[in-house]
Amino acid sequence: MVKCDKSPVAPASLKVEKLKGENGSYRGEDVVEQLKTDFHDKCYICELKGLQDPEIEHLVPHKGNLDLKFDWNNLFWSCGHCNSIKNQRKYDGKIINCCQEDPELHIQFLYTDNNIDVKPLDDHEETQMTAQLVDEVFNLRNTGMRVIKSAQRMKALQREMNIFFNELKRYQENKSETNKRRVVVRLKRSAAFAAFKRSYIRNKDEYAEFQEYVSLMK
């Protein structure tokens, strides 16, 4: 999970649909397209990119509350897998708003030996619960479908990290501007699984020239 710069202007359909009450829809074409663009077509929780099963997720469950249901600031781009796991009651209203707060200030997203370690850096409830959620979307296997979907995300992360490590190796062997740019592109917040790559660089003193690209948004 990384910081997302979300458009401050709510899509017009939300206001229109809210007037319809319970029959209104927050899934208008303008909402879908704006969320897809703002979140770079990746799930805000697991950071899988190019979603085949995108869903519009409410950061705070609306439970029939029309203000929450149609609040642009409460709508996020998610995959079905992460949305289903976050729907556990224990997470209600306890997840970091990555459009207002930089999750990387509060959590380390570590990738080691083909596995993840999501470490909260403070004792705030939102930090603790967000770290737990990210861990669960990669590791929770309490149903048959979750076994498959969690494994798919772990494999996708492993593939992306292997590509990233190869780009770093290429750069170490030849520190050209072209090779540097190839690394920098994968450190952008818009990249797949950016939090894990950015944490990796942030914890490596030998990559001082890349630290400016993984700065935190305080």
Spans of features found by a protein language model:
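Conserved, surface-exposed functional patches that form binding/active-site neighborhoods
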Residues: 90-172
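C-terminal, charged low-complexity interaction regions
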Residues: 135-218
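Short, charged surface segments at domain edges that flank catalytic/cofactor-binding sites
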Residues: 1-42, 65-70, 162-169
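DNA major-groove recognition helix of helix-turn-helix/homeodomain DNA-binding modules
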Residues: 82
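Histidine-centered nuclease catalytic patch
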Residues: 45-78, 86-107
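Amphipathic, alpha-helical segments enriched in basic
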Residues: 18, 31-34, 50, 54-57, ...
